[in-house]
């Protein structure tokens, strides 16, 4: 464990606690220290890594503190991504692994939508560059067509399906996977190999038609289906032609259209056509007319070409690669090599080798002699011997007349094989390579030298011939070349099938090669034209044309492979070759001609982005006004902003929403706009000039109004309003406190009750007994705790005596109702008994009289652990006075060495020389002698290393010198005994699990003392330290509540005041400095109290304060902010009563006693608390008050309301009881107006639907009044105030339900599942289910469509869930209630009106909370009867999501989300005021990858997690490892990592204006363990190093 903020880790804390101890023979504590010290564990490198990350993060914060403190430091999601990439200029050039297919359908670009919309209306050919998303448009269109077809089938029409046609078999699987990942419909892929045996099976294709929606196949498949009439063209709804430029002449694309498409006379039955290509023509003819070629393509496909402008294209692809030409010396014709000549003599006339000889003759000139010889080596591979024989034999079999000649050819072929195998191939040298090949090696060496510098290179070398690709790859594998280019990892990619004897491959091999290229295993492909189009090859940063392209489209497509930033497109041309020079320039000319032609298409066929900026930029008539004094400028576009800001400063009624209204009407010459300002504006309207577009007309009107306002002095020289609206004064106040900012405070260690000493007149008894007495190993009887004042009864709590449930027992602390007036003798007697217990059992010898004791212990008699004492009047009757008398008269039992056997049974023995040795005698062992060896298994003492291991020496604990002078009796009897346990913290379950139980030993009693206390009393007295610790903590907690005037039961008070770790409030982190055995902490109560505090202050604000929703939020922030709670807690000294330390074996004794012998007791009266922890305790006390009030015979909220008033000291919350809320409510004026008929009708409809009739219909109408609806129509404000109220009410009722239904769940679980219950998705679902959306009143044109769409969607999901239940054999009403999770977020108004309705219901019923509970029970609770179905809902939260991605998906163990406080303004007032911001960063392998700045740690972590999710969600593990150099192994993840947070910043301010779903905190550990498991594991680690039972 590492050290945070100067706090010692548990290991070090334990060490420091013991290091300064001195050996004390009279102390039992020393033995614990000696025997419980664990073996050193292995060094924990993870903790070292954490500390290194912490240091790196703090250094980064310091280096960037000024920039982070600026207002603009809070980055947007995009800027966070840019920042991440800016740290490594080559990040985007890393190879990209094949990942689960991206759902690109979710975020199309604007031009894609426009092309899609066009394709929906008519047949279209989309002309777009490689990598610009043509397939996405096709998928959008496919989905649209399928949806249309589904609708048509519903009407009884014949089923039709979609065909996606590709030109290459290799593209079938690729496009099938891509489409299947982006469509929720059945998709299959077919090519010749899959249906070769099915051509005569019509049934196969009939089944295909019924089961599939999309078929991806080679065009030949569809053609043959249509040809054989397995399908007809009318059964096809859409045909997508990939690489549509192939549709010419007799290509199968063209034949499908000519032979089948045109044969269907009914145009309505013809399928829609969509073509995709990078260029509409594919020809080498440079003289061809683009108009004619494109016209032919359009005519053939019966489609229109559509494209996008160059400007939008550049926005998509960024910048094109930098094109360069590398020239090589002229290649001269070379003679065949010696190997080739010898082989020609042997097999030169055989037709099987003709193609290889042709390739070798080409290679010797084009590539060089080495490559020509290498070709023969590749042809005559060892594994090809059998194939060669078979092919020669096959040739001979086909011509029986040439048997002799064939035999001779076979012999020659074998001789040729032997020649090649024995040939000595020279290494590739400059002389054996052509100038062209040599130039390629130079280029590759130059490019891959960047890889050595840390820049990843992905390269494709395009060639024309298959054998060229194979030979170049073989060349680069040679040691001589690898020395020059060590980072190159090559492979060839060629078309499937055979190309001579060397260049062949399979489709499977193609896929593997491309996959390895994505993975980064290969970084250089030598490829033929197969890599130019279609195949999903990741973008590269180097593309080399070894052989120049033959057509313009090849040029465009191969260039399109270089899509990365700072890419290079290299053309290799022969020096002085006019043909190469012509093609070098002609391709650019041809491309530009194609672009010019496409841009010359009609305007409706060029998709351009219609933005305001474009409209303004294209119109030079717009005006710019420059303010003379400040030089501020006012443009058309900015005038819209200036006007909106001005209106925001106008005075308004609390419920009034001010806005700017525009009217644009067509006039002669264009459009003219007019602007209208609210009635409170000094100027009401202005009219602009006539412009060519509506947008310009609107801007002109705003511009004219701004000029009028400036001229009338309503705008200053900086174009700011002079009518300053007074915003809420504390809107930007720093209200949060840090959970990591810790201070040392005084801590109450003893209750005030113990301070009362002196003469006493009466005593009150509390019986301490066990519910399961058998758990304690030994028989026991209750003991009595006698106090000067009556003690309250506390709830039972568990003690853990050992391992397993059988060793667990609850303690019952039963106060007796009647006091007892003891005599002086009796007081001194029980005082002596108490001191005897301290001396004999706990090795502490105190000097005290009865007047010094705050409490006494007394043995019991005549009662057992389960005895009913309710009728007992006088406690004196159950005290064992005989035992008291014995302890008063003598401190030990006399021993004469000749006692009978019965004497040695059931007595308690202590060692006066070693306080750690206590024993329970069991029986005498006459068969053993003191000189006998100690039997095996006896626990070894600490002081007999240098003595003989006899029973006598075992019994004597003197040091060596003292032992030598001691003469022991050799005839004394040996006693069998059991070693008494030294464990004191019986409250700690983990410590109990480590207990070994009773241990047998053998003693002689000469040097030991036999106690007067009976064994059964001793056993119960052993439990007293744990009991008194819990009792004292309870009393101190109760005192805190009494000081605040809150009558909270003692048990609940203790829970509310208990903080058991330094980061109790951080549920997503492993506990730090965990204090075991303290019982329940305040977390659950704080969760409950926080929610009630929000509800209570919301009701008070709605009741008393007239203001808008923003002002409500500000006021509520002031009331419930942690800073406010902290201040009042400190004023009340609440921090002194917080219980933050676990049981300490040295501090539980009564205060004020004089210690005569034994280790000195410690006084630990200080503790360090975080500011937020103190504020959390305040909320926990509110939660405790709430539970107390709800537990009354008549459940109410009065005590909780009083607690809110006490804790907040707010001027807006002075209520002492629930009834005070409604008593303070005054009906607003707008509710006093008689309702209209429309409002009454709404009231009736809601009555029929909901069962409740509103007393005030106008209040109900208000719940459905959208802010866009003008108030002057009905003089009813919008629902925003009611929504503010209803939001808090629904939060409270949901939290109350979860809290009571799941008493064993921690706040982390409660928060995560509350997210589901109060999410906008769910509330929107309920609103639609109740039909509330039909009652919404608004004036937003787009809102209606959004509501309708979402309502239909959620209704459909509900119906599907019902049908699924029926299909599963369930009742329809038992459908799965989590169907709404899959629905996207609704329009915001839908959850708003649900909350507003609940708020209105609450107000209309006179603040009757039971009405809210009734609404919850009927309409919300049924969805959450089984909460387990929402267990994964929280995984959508960014912090949880990114943690899962990095640690689980990527397996990285060096990931941190860290936060740090910084001054709000390091150069200004922030240094003076102490105002802070919080910066959160995502650190991976010690570097900050992205960051965010916010007002609190909670929101900063949320923001940076969103950035990280955006970056890493679609990244593959391989790309992650390459990008960050991650080499983490599974064993690295030992649970000591995950979401680590700097322990200095975690502020929690009030929620933003619109509530968001409460951010869940991450619970994912990289080991898959929950935080609860981590806490338990941490607890065990701590207890391993604290006191334990045995030596």
From Swiss-Prot:
One of its GO terms (molecular function) is ribonuclease III activity. InterPro entries: Dicer_dimer_sf (IPR038248), Dicer_dimerisation_dom (IPR005034), DSRM_2 (IPR056755), Helicase/UvrB_N (IPR006935), Helicase_ATP-bd (IPR014001), Helicase_C-like (IPR001650), P-loop_NTPase (IPR027417), PAZ_dom (IPR003100). ATP binds at residues 128-135. The record marks 1388 as: Important for activity. Its EC number is 3.1.26.-, 3.6.4.-. It is an enzyme of class 3 (hydrolase). Keywords: Antiviral defense, Antiviral protein, ATP-binding, Helicase, Hydrolase, Magnesium, Manganese, Metal-binding, Nucleotide-binding, Repeat, RNA-binding, Zinc. The keyword Zinc applies. This is Dicer-like protein 1. It comes from Pyricularia oryzae (strain 70-15 / ATCC MYA-4617 / FGSC 8958). The gene is DCL1.
């Amino acid at each position: 464990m590492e050290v945070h903020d100067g706090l010692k880790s548990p290991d070090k804390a334990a060490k420091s606690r013991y290091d300064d101890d001195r050996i004390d023979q009279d102390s039992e504590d020393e033995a614990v220290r000696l025997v419980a010290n664990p073996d050193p564990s292995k060094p924990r490198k993870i903790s070292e890594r954490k500390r290194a990350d912490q240091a790196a993060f703090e250094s980064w914060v310091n280096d960037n503190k000024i920039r982070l403190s600026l207002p603009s430091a809070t980055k947007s999601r995009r800027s966070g991504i840019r920042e991440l990439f800016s740290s490594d200029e080559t990040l985007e050039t890393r190879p990209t692994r094949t990942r689960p297919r991206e759902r690109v359908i979710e975020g199309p670009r604007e031009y894609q939508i426009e092309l899609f919309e066009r394709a929906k209306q008519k047949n279209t050919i989309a002309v777009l560059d490689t990598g610009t998303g043509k397939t996405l448009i096709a998928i959008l269109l496919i989905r649209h067509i399928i949806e249309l077809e589904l609708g048509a089938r519903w009407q009884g029409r014949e089923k039709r399906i979609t065909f996606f046609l590709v030109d290459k078999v290799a593209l079938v699987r690729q496009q099938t996977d891509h489409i299947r990942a982006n469509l929720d419909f059945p998709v299959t892929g077919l090519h010749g190999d899959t249906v070769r045996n099915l051509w005569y099976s019509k049934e196969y294709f009939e089944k295909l038609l019924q089961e599939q929606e999309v078929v991806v196949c080679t065009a030949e498949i569809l053609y043959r289906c249509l040809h054989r009439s397995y399908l007809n063209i009318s059964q096809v709804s859409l045909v997508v032609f990939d690489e549509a430029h192939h549709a010419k002449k007799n290509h199968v694309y063209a034949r499908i259209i000519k032979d089948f498409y045109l044969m269907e006379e009914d145009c309505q039955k013809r399928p829609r056509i969509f073509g995709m290509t990078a260029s509409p023509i594919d020809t080498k003819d440079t003289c061809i007319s683009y108009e004619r070629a494109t016209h032919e393509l359009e005519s053939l496909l019966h489609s229109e070409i559509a494209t996008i402008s160059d400007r939008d294209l550049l926005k998509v692809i960024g910048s094109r690669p930098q094109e360069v030409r590398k020239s090589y010396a002229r290649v001269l014709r070379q003679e065949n090599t010696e190997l080739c000549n010898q082989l020609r003599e042997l097999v030169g006339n055989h037709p099987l080798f003709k193609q290889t000889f042709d390739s070798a003759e080409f290679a010797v000139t084009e590539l060089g002699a080495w490559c020509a010889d290498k070709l023969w080596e590749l042809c005559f591979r060892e594994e090809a011997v059998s194939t060669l024989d078979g092919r020669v034999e096959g040739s001979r079999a086909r011509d029986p007349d040439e048997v002799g000649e064939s035999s001779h050819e076979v012999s020659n072929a074998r001789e040729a094989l032997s020649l090649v195998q024995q040939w000595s191939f020279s290494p590739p040298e400059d002389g054996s390579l052509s100038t062209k090949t040599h130039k390629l090696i130079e280029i590759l060496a130059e490019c891959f030298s960047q890889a050595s510098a840390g820049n990843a290179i992905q390269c494709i070398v395009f060639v024309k011939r298959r054998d060229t690709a194979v030979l170049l790859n073989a060349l680069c594998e040679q040691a001589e070349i690898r020395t020059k280019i060590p980072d190159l990892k090559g492979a060839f990619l060629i078309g499937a099938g055979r190309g001579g004897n060397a260049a062949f491959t399979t489709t499977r091999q193609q896929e593997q090669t491309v996959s390895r290229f994505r993975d980064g295993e290969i970084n250089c492909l030598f490829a033929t034209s197969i890599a130019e189009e279609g195949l999903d090859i990741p973008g590269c940063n180097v593309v080399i044309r070894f052989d120049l392209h033959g057509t313009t489209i090849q040029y465009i497509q191969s260039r399109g492979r270089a899509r990365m930033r700072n890419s290079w497109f290299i053309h290799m041309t022969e020096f002085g070759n006019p043909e190469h020079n012509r093609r070098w320039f002609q391709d650019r000319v041809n491309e530009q001609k194609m672009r010019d032609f496409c841009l010359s298409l009609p305007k409706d066929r060029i998709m351009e982005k219609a933005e305001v900026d474009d409209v303004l930029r294209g119109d030079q008539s717009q005006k710019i006004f420059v303010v003379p004094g400040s030089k501020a400028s006012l443009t058309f576009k900015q005038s819209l902003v200036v006007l909106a800001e001005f209106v925001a400063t106008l005075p308004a009624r609390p419920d009034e929403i001010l806005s700017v209204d525009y009217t644009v009407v067509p006039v002669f010459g264009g459009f003219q706009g007019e602007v209208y300002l609210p009635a409170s504006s000094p100027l009401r309207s202005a009219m602009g000039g006539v412009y060519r577009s509506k947008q310009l007309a609107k801007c002109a009107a705003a511009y004219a109004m701004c000029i009028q306002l400036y001229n009338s002095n309503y705008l200053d020289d900086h174009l700011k309003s002079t009518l300053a609206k007074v915003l809420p004064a504390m809107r930007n106040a720093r209200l949060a406190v840090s959970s990591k900012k810790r201070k040392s405070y005084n801590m109450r260690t003893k209750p005030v009750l113990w301070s009362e000493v002196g003469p006493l007149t009466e005593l009150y008894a509390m019986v301490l007994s066990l519910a399961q007495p058998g758990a304690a190993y030994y028989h026991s009887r209750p003991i009595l705790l006698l106090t000067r004042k009556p003690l309250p009864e506390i709830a039972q709590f568990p003690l853990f005596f050992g391992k397993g449930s059988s060793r667990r027992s609850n303690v019952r602390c039963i106060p007796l109702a009647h006091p007892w007036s003891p005599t002086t003798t009796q007081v001194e007697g029980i005082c002596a008994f108490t001191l005897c217990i301290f001396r004999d059992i706990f090795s502490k010898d105190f000097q005290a009289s009865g007047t010094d004791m705050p409490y006494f212990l007394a043995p019991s008699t005549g009662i057992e652990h389960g005895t009913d004492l309710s009728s007992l009047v006088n406690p004196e009757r159950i005290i064992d006075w005989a035992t008291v008398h014995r302890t008063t008269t003598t401190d030990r039992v006399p021993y004469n060495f000749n006692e009978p056997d019965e004497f040695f049974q059931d007595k308690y023995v202590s060692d006066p020389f070693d306080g750690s040795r206590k024993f329970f005698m069991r029986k005498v062992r006459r068969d053993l002698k003191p000189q006998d060896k100690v039997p095996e298994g006896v626990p070894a003492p600490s002081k007999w290393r240098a003595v003989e291991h006899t029973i006598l020496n075992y019994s004597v604990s003197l040091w060596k010198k003292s032992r030598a002078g001691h003469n022991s009796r050799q005839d004394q009897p040996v006693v069998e005994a059991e070693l008494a346990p030294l464990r004191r913290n019986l409250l700690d379950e983990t410590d109990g699990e480590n207990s070994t139980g009773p241990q047998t030993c053998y003693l002689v009693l000469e040097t030991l003392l036999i106690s007067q206390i009976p064994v059964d009393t001793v056993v119960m007295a052993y439990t007293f330290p744990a009991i008194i610790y819990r009792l004292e903590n309870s009393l101190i907690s109760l005192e805190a509540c009494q000081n605040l005037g809150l009558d909270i039961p003692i048990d609940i008070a203790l829970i509310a005041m208990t903080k058991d770790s330094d980061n109790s409030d951080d549920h997503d982190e492993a506990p730090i400095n965990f204090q075991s055995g303290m019982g329940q902490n305040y977390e659950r109560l704080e969760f409950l109290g926080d929610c009630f505090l929000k509800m209570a202050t919301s009701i008070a604000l709605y009741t008393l304060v007239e203001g808008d929703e923003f002002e409500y939020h500000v006021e509520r922030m002031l009331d419930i902010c942690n800073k406010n709670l902290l201040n009042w807690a400190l004023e009340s000294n609440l921090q002194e009563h917080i219980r933050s330390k676990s049981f300490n074996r040295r501090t539980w004794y009564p205060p004020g006693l004089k210690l005569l012998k034994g280790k000195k007791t410690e006084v630990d009266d200080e503790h360090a608390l975080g500011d937020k922890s103190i504020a959390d305790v305040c909320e926990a006390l509110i939660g405790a008050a709430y539970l107390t009030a709800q537990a009354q015979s008549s459940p109410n909220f009065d005590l909780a309301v009083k607690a809110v008033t006490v804790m907040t000291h707010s001027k807006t919350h002075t209520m002492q009881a629930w009834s005070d809320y409604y008593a303070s409510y005054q009906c607003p004026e707008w509710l006093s107006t008689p309702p209209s008929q429309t409002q009454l009708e709404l009231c009736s409809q809601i009555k029929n639907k909901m069962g409740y009739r509103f007393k005030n219909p106008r209040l109900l109408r208000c719940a459905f009044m959208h802010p866009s609806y003008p108030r002057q129509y009905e003089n009813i404000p919008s629902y925003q105030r009611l929504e503010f109220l209803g939001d808090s009410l629904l939060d409270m009722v949901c939290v109350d339900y979860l809290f009571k239904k799941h008493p064993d769940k921690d706040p982390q679980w409660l928060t995560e599942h509350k997210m589901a219950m109060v999410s906008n998705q769910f509330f929107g679902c309920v609103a639609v289910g109740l039909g509330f959306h039909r009652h919404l009143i608004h004036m937003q044109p787009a809102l209606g469509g959004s509501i309708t769409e979402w309502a239909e969607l959620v209704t459909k999901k509900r119906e599907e869930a019902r049908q699924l239940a029926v299909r599963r054999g369930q009742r329809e009403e038992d459908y799965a209630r989590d169907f709404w999770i899959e629905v996207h977020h609704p329009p915001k108004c839908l959850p708003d009106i649900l909350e507003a309705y609940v708020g209105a219901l609450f107000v209309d019923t006179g603040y009757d909370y039971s009405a809210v509970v009734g609404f919850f029970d009927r309409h919300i609770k049924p969805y959450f009867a089984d909460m387990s179905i929402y267990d994964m809902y929280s995984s959508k939260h960014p912090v949880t999501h990114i943690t899962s991605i990095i640690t689980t998906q990527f397996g990285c163990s060096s990931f941190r989300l860290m936060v740090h406080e910084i001054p709000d303004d390091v150069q200004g007032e922030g240094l003076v005021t102490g105002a802070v911001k919080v910066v959160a960063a995502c650190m991976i392998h010690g570097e900050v990858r992205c960051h965010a700045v916010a007002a609190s740690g909670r929101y900063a972590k949320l923001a940076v997690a969103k950035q990280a999710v955006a970056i890493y969600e679609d990244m593959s593990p391989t790309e992650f490892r390459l990008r960050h150099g991650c080499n983490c192994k599974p064993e690295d993840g030992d649970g000591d990592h995950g979401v680590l947070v700097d322990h200095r910043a975690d502020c929690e301010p009030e929620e933003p204006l619109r509530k968001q779903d409460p951010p869940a905190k991450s619970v994912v550990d990289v080991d898959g363990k929950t935080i609860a498991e981590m806490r338990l594991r941490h607890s065990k680690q701590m207890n391993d190093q604290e006191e334990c039972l045995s030596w």
